[in-house]
């Protein structure tokens, strides 16, 4: 059997809210993500709990990864990054393929931005090895991101076999595409958009 291709989508959910936090958008997000038909979803700023907002009639009690996972009938894994007394959010990986959670690594470099790397594996049909999926959310400031590139590279070098197929996806907060160059050089990875479009 020849290996089946895998499609992925990465999306920052903004904690399930619209711009300026005016409207709850979780169900619309679930519909839009479902319409894409991707095998694996890499999601950032996923609300796990928000006790204050859940008092609103339009804000769901259930974690947003469960709402989307139930809507699409996907397996799911959630890693808390930012934890407060009455709320928490983080990264999530959802998959139509069987999903195994390996680790949730704190890659925060300051007190203002709590960031993480969620490590899961999926086994696509016909593949010999599991596909390693790393979902990340990186800082806004470039000097902070440089530290986080090193943390990601160190983690991959330590825990991921060199022959393993690997996808690193997420919100890199990187408008100048330095993450692709830095991580590509350090880990011998290709940037999918550059491969597909040449830019």
Language model features with spans:
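Beta-strand-turn-beta hairpins that frame and shape the catalytic cleft
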Residues: 1-8, 89-91, 95-100, 113-135
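Short, solvent-exposed loop/turn elements at beta->coil junctions and helix N-caps
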Residues: 79-84, 107-109, 196
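N-terminal, active-site-proximal structural segment of metallo-dependent hydrolase catalytic domains
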Residues: 1-71, 83-85, 129, 150-151
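Active-site metal-binding loops of divalent metal-dependent hydrolases
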Residues: 11-13, 46, 138, 165, ...
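Conserved beta strand-loop-helix elements of the APE1-like EEP
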Residues: 69-72, 86-101, 199
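Glycine-rich phosphate-binding loop signature in dinucleotide/nucleotide-binding domains
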Residues: 35-37, 124-128, 158-164
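Metal-dependent phosphoesterases centered on the DNase I-like endonuclease/exonuclease/phosphatase
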Residues: 40, 142-199
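Active-site environment of divalent metal-dependent phosphoester hydrolases
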Residues: 15-18, 48-51, 84-87, 141-143, ...
């Amino acid at each position: 059997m020849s290996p089946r291709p895998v499609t992925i989508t990465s999306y920052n959910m903004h904690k399930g809210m619209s711009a300026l936090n005016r409207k709850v958008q979780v169900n619309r997000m679930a519909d839009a993500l479902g319409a894409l038909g991707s095998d694996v979803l890499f999601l950032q700023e996923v609300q796990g709990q928000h006790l204050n907002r859940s008092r609103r009639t339009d804000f769901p009690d259930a974690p947003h990864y469960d709402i989307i996972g139930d809507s699409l009938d996907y397996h799911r894994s959630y890693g808390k990054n930012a934890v407060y007394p009455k709320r928490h959010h983080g990264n999530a990986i959802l998959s139509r393929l069987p999903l195994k959670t390996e680790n949730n690594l704190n890659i925060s470099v300051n007190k203002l931005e709590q960031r993480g790397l969620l490590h899961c594996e999926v086994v696509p049909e016909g593949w010999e090895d599991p596909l390693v999926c790393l979902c990340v959310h990186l800082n806004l400031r470039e000097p902070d991101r440089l530290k986080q590139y090193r943390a990601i590279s160190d983690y991959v070098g330590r825990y991921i076999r060199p022959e393993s197929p690997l996808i690193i996806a997420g919100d890199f907060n990187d408008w100048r595409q330095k993450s692709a160059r830095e991580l590509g050089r350090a880990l011998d990875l290709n940037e999918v958009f550059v491969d597909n479009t040449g830019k």
